[in-house]
Amino acid sequence: MDNRGSFFFLLIVFYLLLSSQSRPPLLDQDRERQREVARERDALRLLNESKYGDFDPPGDKWLPFAGTRKNDSYAWGILPEAQGRARHQLRSAISNAGLEPPRSLEDPDALPSLNLTQLLLPVYRNATGKLRGDWVRRKLNKEYPKLNTTAIALEHGYFTHEFGLNITGSSGTFYLDLREGGGEELRVDSGQVREIRATLAVESNDFWGNTWYISLFGVHFPETGAIILSSNSEKFEGLFVLPHLAFSSDAYELSHQLLLNSLSDTLSEKENRPPTLFPWSSLIGSEQVEFPAPKCEHIIYLQQHPVTIHDYLADKPVVDQIEEELRFPIGAPVPPAPLMVMSAVVFSPDCGYILETKGTPDFPPSEGLYLTGPKIEEYDKYSARLVFIICGVFAAQITLLLRQIKEASTPSTRSRISFYTIALMAFGDAFVLIFILLELYPAVSFLVMATAAFLTFLSVSYIGMKFMMEIWAVQAPERREQERRSNPPASTPRSTGLPLPATSAPVRDSGATPIILTPDQDPPAEEDDQPTNRGTTSAAQETRNDVGAMYARFYFVLFVMLIISIWSFLWPNRLGALYARALAFVYLSFWTPQIGRNIIRNCRKALRWDFVIGQSILRLFPFVYFLTVRGNVLFIHPDTTTAFALAGWVWIQVWVLASQDILGPRFFVPRGWAPAAYDYHPILRDGDESEADLESGGVLPIGALRAEDLSGDAKDEDKQRTKDRKRAVFDCAICMQEIEVPVLAARGSAGGSSVTEGATSILSRRTYMVTPCRHIFHSTCLESWMRLRLQCPICRESIPPV
């Protein structure tokens, strides 16, 4: 085999991996980069020269930064109203905790003289965590002029006037992810401030629903729990404006000094970095965005509420001890960490709207007030516990699957199992793992995730796939037979001119020696040995090719479904929710293919009952958790209706399987709707062999059985019974014990109705089985025998699977 192409391909890949990834910038790029650095140096100088009160849009005071100039036509007239709502939320948070708020909070004119950084509250000093809460759109008191989008598009070279991140709808849900650490921090006698970054997902509650993702950077005052966040882009230099958005002069001074230090370090780092088209990198280590598009800018005021333990205000030293134990656990006797609670006001200066969280007294407590969520340490702990539970679920599923594989160790038992039932289970395992990895990978250690991934690989790609391949190979002849029946070969005319005489037969051997057939009517071995071997070899090769095609199709369908499912995150919320519920319904229908195969094959006991019940409970667990627990780690909206519907659907399927096991696989299927299949549990009735119709199933004359009746009709214990009903006793050739079977009266005899007789004998029929060759055995004996071979124990004739 020629491998020169592969060698050259690997050589090129090796060269690309070892080659330097950094290239000197082009001359035009270097000049643009120098101009960009000069502009940013000038902006930093202007920030250093500014002072508190320089930015006052109602007083016609503006800043020289992009987005805060007078001719930018932003709706800065809404800023006082947004700040008023933020002050109101601060007062409510202090009052609800049982503390007395400063009186100067009521008077906006007295705010500049207020020392907000000295307002010490019992709050978490590290605000890193994940929070969720409902929001409403605030109705503005007056109309403001619309943004001059044409001028902005011309200034920045945008190819469209459509703004992204324009939040619509009157209500929805906030999903806030706060991250501290790795940024600048400033500690002085007057207070403390540090950098913070956040990601805000805004979900609307309109009909289709939409979700917007906003990246934010800002400052956090740990002593008071106040946070100011802003977006940043080439048309809005939000980081330079942040200090001027503070409520008091002391907060301005702290944030002003912090940002001067941080932005100076960032600019120094940027001078040594390859060029980028993004005009400003917000924080050190933040991601850069090349080719920005126009979008709505946002400013967010967050206020953390004082921590309460069992509805009592916590002391500040206790809160510090809780935080210390969370970050460096040593087993200290501290109370469990309460959830973080925050109020939020979201203000868009260019798109002109205000969003705020629900709070008292405007909304009752039953509405789900404020933003609530665990600190990141608690969230990581909950996530790790969930992954551990998922690992336990996978381990239990693997155990049940191994038991079922051991039970279905013969071709007879494997032919009863539906391939699509096992395939749906494997699909579900793969989906559960991949989406948990996508959502919880940053919160859970690599070792825990590797354990879950290994168990899933074991369940899907090793044990499950091996079982599916065995089932697929065993059922290959059945599929080929169905294809032959659906596509019969076209008849070809004889090549000879005249047909043979009716009394003649084609001569196969012209020798004088006659052909003597064996008693079992088998053809001569020398004539058919070679074709049989050739046919067996071709059938085995065809089966191997069929299994390989199934393997490729399985992973192709899995890959396509994963791509579509990941793409569904970008769909409108309602459409994505409908897709997720439809996918869950299809996945939890894994018993439906088995029910259908039981009907087609007319078989009852295909799966172990511990496998059926165990898999049903284990595979329902993730759906019940995420759809019923409000504080689940993925912040999925509770939907008990869907949870109960999915659980009820699985319950119905299990009951149908149980009914098929007791009443028969086709008890609810009208006669003629399913293909004909042999019934191993016919009703025995008085009559001679001429009335036998074995293929029809249902009723079999007692005289058609090839067994010795040991009892007759004159047994003493049967004399008390009705004349139209008796029992017969036969020998089971497997266990050598007697079989006692009920025998109904012959047709036309006087007695009870056939409906009554059939109802009373439906359970007793399950104790015996009659083969197509008319031999009778105990059900348990013959089923055990048929697990090993599909031959009659007496006459060795082939018999169909149960």
Swiss-Prot record:
Molecular function GO labels: ubiquitin protein ligase activity; zinc ion binding
Span list, region Disordered: 478-541
Enzyme Commission code(s) on record: 2.3.2.27
Glycosylation-annotated residues: N48, N71, N115, N126, N148, N166
PROSITE patterns documented for this protein: ZF_RING_2
InterPro entries, alphabetized: DUF2921 (IPR021319), HRD1_E3_ubiq-ligases (IPR050731), Znf_RING (IPR001841), Znf_RING/FYVE/PHD (IPR013083)
Cytoplasmic side: 403-429, 475-550, 596-608, 664-802
Protein name as catalogued: DSC E3 ubiquitin ligase complex subunit A
Organism: Aspergillus fumigatus (strain ATCC MYA-4609 / CBS 101355 / FGSC A1100 / Af293)
